Amino acid sequence: MAYYFGYGSNMSQEYLEKVRNVYPTKSTIAYLKDYTLKINLKGPNFVEPGFANISYQSGSKVEGILHEISDLELKKIIASEGPEYEVSEITVYTNDKNFLAKTLIWPTDLLEELPTSRRYLNLLLKAAKKNGLSDDYIKEIEKKKAVYYPFLSEYYRIYAYFWVKSRAKKVNK
């Protein structure tokens, strides 16, 4: 069994199940102290220019979801996220406890934020609202810059779905 802290698309249980083939036994709101959410992981192209990452910032807080999953499911998340992220062990807090959990962080010196796709931003917002993250945190996510290109954005949404799903399926043990 593993604890995994999701702060981007992995806040969404629906996304974890349908795309990554990960079925958490329990999920709860949690937060990480002294980190901030940034869109500074460079995406593959101008249609998906940036993805969520977290970086150290004293006094800040990242809200997300703490998932209880199997070790195999953690491997699926790692494999389907791609090689840019590193697995980090962190302490996350819920209303009544703290947990040692794994999360993925892309080590970078890139401080400026990149735009993200409208598709990805909507995924983050839907997950944050559905899971009951704070209104202030949702407002911070809403401030992120997003891009949308008719046809190309829809095509890439389908491509990304199958790319992530195929990487998660390759993990069997």
Regions found by a protein language model. Give the residues of each.
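A glycine-rich, hydrophobic/aromatic-adjacent loop/helix-cap motif
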Residues: 1-173
